[in-house]
């Protein structure tokens, strides 16, 4: 039986202890302390900077144990994870120490108990590499603490720690089941499975195995059995994410879970070749997911920590976010290495909903060391992660981390941390693919703006139609958050204009990455004029994000099968940002950009390849018309292409009886016309079609050619 304790917290600063305050488990102790002393809403203004004064402090969770037990039962302290370096003490006696936040532990404390016992979890200050720049994420490059906590362009610097996962006292009988882990192998036809259970228990156990409809398929004391005519687990859009159910039980204990049968491989992209002439190099790194013998176009997003306080994330939040991905026709999340691991409930939900998971380890944008101390912690944490996730059908890819083969990280395939992670994935989950980092050769990260001065002021429509990557695994277009959300974070005296005021900067509108990130006011002025209210800038940025992301996703789909993936940066955010690249605002609010992505990721649709976003009277407007299909059936349809200019509709094309084979695209005809001089600020290309395959594109139109030019831009 489980007994949840009431905890108090203590801050230890310069050797001095604070008064005890109420601490919640799961949770983060800095949040509890901030609430106790009155830091205020961490989202508002600059309140979250108050937590910086706590970075070098130690903390203690303390409880007077409360439980009931029979004489025949043992007593255990169980924790799913504590962040980050800590000791566990019973009655001031240290019984366990660990560095890391992802490894669970369970401690038999029976013989240490007196009947009036104090349990303490003592947490050391946050790891900071000696010599690293103060306040910089380089401080995280010698530890396994997720570096996002040290500050990112969408996450404030907020070093948190504590009992972020569930913890409890548990009484156990002699027949307690300590381990119960199923595994399976499939025959070549993938219609028969051999299922095995690894069980640790002092007495015999009964295994029951059910299909999703609760029909009993096997029951007995054997730990291995065969199943005929099995159903496979499929990702969203490709079939049913079918999950079998199991129980393992004896007279006093019972464990249960689910199991999905699937086979996954990472294959070389069709259309990629080694160089034609000598001297030769290799072809681009393989990056096509094959699920159950079927090549899948990965369409999804980068998932980041859903809260700045990781202990507050619960199953409800995870389910809201995963449901949004499913409804947006996505089939994969990349769990970015800077934030890395989620709680168990997230993976359970992805299993159930059919969202594949590309899981990165906790390395990102840093040069991680080869020294034995770091490698020892990394190995322990990585093994815990692999063992926790290898049973999940949704976890289809492991990665060493984010952007480790780039100039700002400087690692390589000879770096010991990445070699270690590869060996661990092979040892503990060898049938799931592993890559050392993203991007690999051939893959692309970026860009992160609609209009980029470093790309000769080309917009994303121009940039991506000329790109040719095997996968676009990060790209983004920012937008400014809603005015209602801004009122929750920006003081009233600053909200009337986007400026370099501290709250705007702290919430990532100005100087988050480049000086203009992420509000990108220069881009908005370029397209819409120098003057504009905050409300107008919000609408303008939403327009750019919507059309930009739609264009990129559809372009990546047109490049299938050479291109195998499109994942925007990013899906969600951990707090209310003033401006960001996310398509779901905190906590789980879809943006207009989200709905544009949802439309772009429909299984089948007509699509237009448009040369650029902004047009003027007298321009020769052109567009290629395509039929995109990543469904598993041949599709048929007809489309009428119309250009709406002001209140005038200009018919451009009728494409009748268009067809596309399963998971194949068809290129149709091109359309063109000379744009007249009309009184309008936009034109809309309309693709009228039946069967939910319609589409439209709202583009900027200017009658006059004089526009505002940002400094340094030639017109």
Q: Can you annotate each of these PLM segments?
A:
Residues 11, 15, 159-162, 398, ...:
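Substrate-binding clefts and catalytic carboxylate motifs of secreted carbohydrate-active enzymes
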Residues 178-180, 246, 258, 383-502, ...:
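Active-site region of glycoside hydrolase catalytic domains
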Residues 1-333, 558-559, 563, 589, ...:
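Secreted/periplasmic carbohydrate-active enzymes, especially glycoside hydrolases
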Residues 57, 317, 377-381, 413-417, ...:
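Soluble or luminal CAZymes and related metallo-dependent hydrolases
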